[in-house]
Swiss-Prot record:
Enzyme Commission designation: 1.1.-.-
Active site, UniProt feature: 564 (proton acceptor)
Residues glycosylated per entry: 49, 93, 198, 261, 283, 429, 486, 526, 575
The gene coding this protein: patE
One CC-aspect GO term: extracellular matrix
Gene induction: Expression is correlated with the production of patulin. Expression is positively regulated by the secondary metabolism regulator laeA. Expression is strongly decreased with increased sucrose concentrations. This decrease is lost in the presence of malic acid. Expression is increased with pH changes from 2.5 to 3.5 in the presence of a limiting concentration of sucrose, 50 mM. Natural phenols present in apple fruits such as chlorogenic acid or the flavonoid epicatechin modulate patulin biosynthesis.
Protein name in UniProt: Patulin synthase
Pathway: Mycotoxin biosynthesis; patulin biosynthesis
Length: 628
């Protein structure tokens, strides 16, 4: 799209943060005077040796949440160490506009943007014919909440019971964890007048908090026409309409709730929500463009972090604790280069051993995604390639915070267990037995209606057909991943990228489910409800992909991750040698160090983990401060 006025507004918004800080008497907790508090720069650190009460490594989804809450809850001074900067400034407005969420996330190694992304790539993947893929990760304030697809939904009640059982802590049950979900939120109901016809939303606001949280969640001011037809097709194949996916149940379909600012329709991230709030607190300091290189220990107590900013090395020290929130790849990497991890790995790189934790970097879990695409006779995001349509969409977004740019491409989310009799026909006895181990409310497959073309997912923008047709897709994601990957290091230097091996689609259960899920998309497109809007047969991959072997071949060539890497510093019981943190997120075997991000999850819950990470950060902040 053309650059809208959004980037100018973003720059002004960032630059003006200091000007809107609350006035009042100077805090007794700080020596800053009131005039200094009104300057943006007062909230940001400069590269030199300093000491704070708490250090948070990583300014991403969980990192900015826990840092802001700790400062707010009066624990003392808090510093955030973030390698990136403001995505609004480093990526134009592409990171702000919901419809632009597919920029720089393809599997091609050159489909990345160094201003906001780490440029990580995987090892050759056996489950994808040895393909090496770019794995998008947010290198910016907001982290991957600035890069994701903005879906906000929660796991199931039984998944939370399994979490509580796995870590031996009842505070992770649905009933006890729900308040931490609610604490973050500022929910705004759907604006049906702007969404358009036949797109009304059924939701349950009773579980969406009291509205005083900083994180805006709402429904886009535009609904894709494809979705209005898709909901009837879902009903035809057995997926009934639910009142949203926030109440601990997922089986069925609903319009998705998204982390979008309800007024501007800009992306909402931990930076636009928690950090903007936190900058008003004189006890919060942010070090941007600051790469954490190593955690320092005295005996087994974490006491500081070696940091590098633009070639300058310095140390930030912690009086009380350090919270590691660098994500599923770099949290285990930082632990290992600091001496916490598998002893053999550390020895191979001459890293002094602080604690032998074999599970560091292991147990990686992730969700994959792929989709067939059809030509359709309704407007989708394909129409943005038409200059006249795009110009009107631009005006709608800038002038009314509405129109197709307000929509993040996906609309309806739906979950199911593969139903009978297809289940018995499609699955081996082994696969049926393994899937039976999951709770009754845990779905096996997620469907996402997508108003656009999917293809091989190498570069969504480059590969988008420009033939004048509108395209729509039904994406599928596997919710019971059995394949396990790992993360390791090749150097004691945290500046050297970690080795990332997701090991996708290598377990036979995942393989059978991947084929079955693709067949279910064809069930969907064969319904009488969806037929009226289809132009011709399946466009991608096409009817020549027919047998199970051909479907699997296609899936291996076309799938990508939906960027839910997790569990590489898994939570568990202290006597579990594969566990890295306990139920309070404390690293086992050392003191004054916690891990709070997706790497700390004991397993990957069904769906999109963003909501869980915000809630986990809220929970651990309360554990630390004791002031909730």
């Amino acid at each position: 799209m053309r650059l809208t006025s959004g980037i100018f507004h973003a720059a002004i918004a960032v630059a003006a943060v200091g000007a809107v800080l609350p006035e009042g008497p100077s805090s007794s907790k700080t020596h800053r005077n009131e005039y200094a508090r009104r300057m943006l720069g007062s909230s940001f650190g400069i590269p030199k040796n300093q000491t704070f009460d708490y250090l948070v490594i990583g300014g991403g989804t969980a990192g900015l949440t826990i840092a802001t809450r700790l400062a707010e809850q009066g624990v003392g001074s808090v510093a955030v160490i973030e390698a990136g900067g403001f995505y609004e400034l480093n990526n134009g407005n592409l990171s702000q506009i919901p419809a632009q969420d597919a920029f720089y996330v393809g599997t091609d190694l050159d489909d990345w943007q160094p201003g906001i992304d780490w440029g990580f790539h995987t090892t050759p993947q056996a489950g994808a014919y040895d393909r090496v893929s770019h794995y998008a990760r947010g290198k910016c304030l907001g982290g991957s909440s600035a890069r994701n697809y903005m879906a906000y939904q929660r796991g199931t009640k039984a998944a939370h019971q399994r979490w509580a059982d796995t870590v031996g802590d009842s505070s992770y049950t649905w009933e006890q964890f729900l308040p931490f979900f609610e604490k973050s939120l500022h929910f705004t109901p759907a604006n049906d007048a702007l969404r358009g016809a036949n797109a009304s939303v059924v939701s349950d606001p009773s579980v969406l908090g009291n509205g005083d949280g900083p994180l805006s969640v709402t429904y886009p001011h535009y609904a894709q026409a494809f979705a209005t037809w898709a909901k009837h097709a879902f009903i035809e194949i057995g997926l009934q309409i639910r009142s949203g996916f926030q109440s601990g149940a997922l089986l069925g379909q609903s319009y998705g709730l998204y982390t979008i600012n309800a007024t501007t329709m800009h992306r909402e991230s931990s930076e636009t929500s928690f950090l903007r709030k936190g900058l008003a607190d004189p006890n919060l300091t942010v070090f941007q463009s600051a790469l954490a290189k190593r955690i320092r220990f005295q005996d087994k107590r974490a006491v500081g972090v070696d940091v590098e900013t633009m070639g300058r090395a310095y140390t930030l020290s912690a009086r009380k604790e350090i919270v590691l929130s660098a994500g599923a790849f770099q949290s285990p990497q930082l632990l290992m280069v600091s001496g916490v991890g598998p002893a053999a790995t550390l020895k191979a790189h001459n890293i002094p051993l602080v604690a032998d934790r074999p599970g560091v970097g292991q147990n990686m879990q992730d969700h994959i995604i792929y989709a067939p695409s059809y030509r359709v006779n309704v407007i989708t995001q394909s129409a943005l390639l038409n200059e006249e349509f795009e110009a009107q969409a631009n005006r709608d977004y800038n002038e009314r915070a509405a129109g197709i740019y307000a929509n993040p491409t996906s609309d309806i989310l739906a979950w199911e267990k593969i139903p009978e009799p297809k289940r018995s026909a499609w699955f081996s006895n082994h696969t049926r037995q393994v899937l039976a181990e999951y709770p009754d409310d845990w779905p096996e497959v997620e469907f996402l209606t997508m108003g656009g073309y999917f293809g091989y997912q190498r570069n969504y923008i480059r590969d988008n057909p420009s033939d004048g047709y509108n395209y729509a897709s039904l994406a599928v994601s596997l919710c019971t991943p059995r394949s396990r990957g790992n993360v390791t290091i090749t150097s004691p230097d945290a500046g050297v990228p970690p080795v990332i091996n997701p090991n996708w689609l290598t377990d036979p259960v995942d393989v059978e489910l991947a084929v079955a899920a693709f067949k279910r998309t064809r069930d969907f497109f064969n319904t009488t409800a969806i037929k009226p809007i289809l132009i011709g047969p399946e466009y991608f991959p096409g009817s020549q992909v027919a047998t199970d072997a051909e479907i699997l071949d296609h899936v291996r060539k076309s799938f990508d991750t939906i960027f839910h890497a997790s569990c590489t510093c898994a939570m568990g019981l202290a006597n579990d040698t594969q566990a890295v943190v306990d139920s309070k997120a404390r690293v086992i075997g050392v003191e004054a160090l916690r891990v709070v991000d997706a790497s700390a999850l004991p397993f990957l819950p069904p769906g999109h983990p963003q909501s869980t990470l915000y809630a986990l950060a809220e929970k651990i902040a309360c554990e630390i401060s004791g002031n909730c």
